[in-house]
Amino acid sequence: MPAKEIAFHQGAREAILRGVQTLAEAVAVTLGPKGRNVVIEKSFGSPTITKDGVTVAKEIEVENKFENMGAQMVREVASQTSDKAGDGTTTATVLARALFEEGLKLVAAGHNPMDLKRGIDRAVEVIVAELKKLSKPTQGKKDIAQVGTISANGDETIGNIIAEAMEKVGKEGVITVEEAKGLETTLDVVEGMQFDRGYSSPYFVTNPDRMEAVLEDPFILITEKKISAMADLIPVLEQVARSGKPLLIVAEDVEGEALATLVVNKLRGTLHVCAVKAPGFGDRRKEMLKDIATLTGGNVVAEELGIKLEQLTVKDLGRAKRITIDKENTTIVDGEGKREDIEARIKQIRAQIEETTSDYDREKLQERLAKLVGGVAVINVGAATETEMKEKKARVEDALHATRAAVEEGIVPGGGVAYLRALQALKKLEVPEGDQRFGVAIVQKALEYPARRIAENAGWDGAVVVSRINDGKAAHGFNAASEVFEDLEKAGVIDPTKVSRTALQNAASVASLLLTTEAMVAEKPKKKGAPAGGGMGGMGGMDEMDY
């Protein structure tokens, strides 16, 4: 085991502080609408230019090992906030630094770090409860657009596109972000349920120009079995043919005699039919087939359920208003399943999302939920260069997370004002005499930092701006974009409550841990070994040569 270096007490905490300050300062310059860009060197390719706090934080490593530990702890604050709320990473970093700096002054003056931690925890609980009281639910497209705009660093186009996407697919809908080929940022919406399986044979196509099959008001046969013998299908096909409606067959596979017979009947015009493979694999396939059955009001043909293909009637088949099938995808629009059955299925999937510990499973469950609820939207991000594309795509993803957070827990005034208003609740907080009170005072002071830093980045005196905000009431604060004092809610300067809450909780958690640190252990840097053996005789002067 390599030898270790150990730092103790105040020396250890001061090393942490230097690391925290280094990282926090690089991140804090990006805060607010007048925040500056940070240019990050890459080992290959062009540098990255960003105004995203977590992107900056992830790139920072400090040479001194003890200082680097402090920097990495604050980086964790930014990452955790980004993962949970999607935004607020810079605010969380600024708060973590403020809480640690203010706390360290008191520890150096002889106050008990454990009591300070208890005071910080009590104060944060009260502030979080007050933020929830200040919170208002989002009302319509306008609020969502404003949250998206602020999170995307003031880009109204991004805010409006996200609001439009959420309006079309609903708050449970899937919204994905992809790179566009051109300069324009556009929105594509797929309504209904879409799964990534196309027709089994191009002979099923009804529109040769677009190479797609469109079935109007069709029946849908859903089975998890392979269909190869035609005899199993004949009874139900005869019933469908008599009705004059089209038929979509969703099966593990349709092959051999069955596929050939279906194609011949389609070409002759006897039966308007199309076959597609079932989506997914294994148990996930079974669940997706049940989703399709629930959405369309049909039954899944499965022997374990006692339903056989040859015994099917049209009552067992699903129905939909329209189905479009191309080479790669099948889209079911307006399935005719019972509303209460669909709601029960949605509730079941939501419960599974809550219970699962796997990120992959959660993502797949959310996709299934979105397909049942409303649809999928794709935001295609356009830009002139690859560097701009990366930066813009990251902003769109941040804005998307922030708008989801706003819909989930509501909104509060932005610009750091919500924290300053929530401070009123600390006046009523009863804390035992002693160092816990100083812990509460640390939080009181730290909560001024976000508003102060936003003002400083806009070229104003932070202390003066905070004083003027404190003189105002409710949502009255400093709009750094227009550099005026006004009602921030009316001006559209709002933050998701979840973002403000998560940023404070994560910052307080890490700052408390750092304040109660008494020792640090790091590996000693390895001494460089002696240079390789001496050169050959007669080679003097080699080290003066130019290469």
UniProtKB/Swiss-Prot annotation:
SUPFAM superfamilies recorded: GroEL apical domain-like, GroEL equatorial domain-like, GroEL-intermediate domain like
GO annotation terms (biological process): protein refolding
Function field: Together with its co-chaperonin GroES, plays an essential role in assisting protein folding. The GroEL-GroES system forms a nano-cage that allows encapsulation of the non-native substrate proteins and provides a physical environment optimized to promote and accelerate protein folding.
Family: Belongs to the chaperonin (HSP60) family.
Protein name: Chaperonin GroEL 1
Region (Disordered): 525-547
Originating organism: Anaeromyxobacter sp. (strain Fw109-5)
Localization in the cell: Cytoplasm
Comp. bias intervals (Gly residues): 531-541
Cellular component GO terms, alphabetical: cytoplasm
Molecular function terms, GO-annotated: ATP binding; ATP-dependent protein folding chaperone; isomerase activity; unfolded protein binding
Keyword ATP-binding belongs to the record: yes
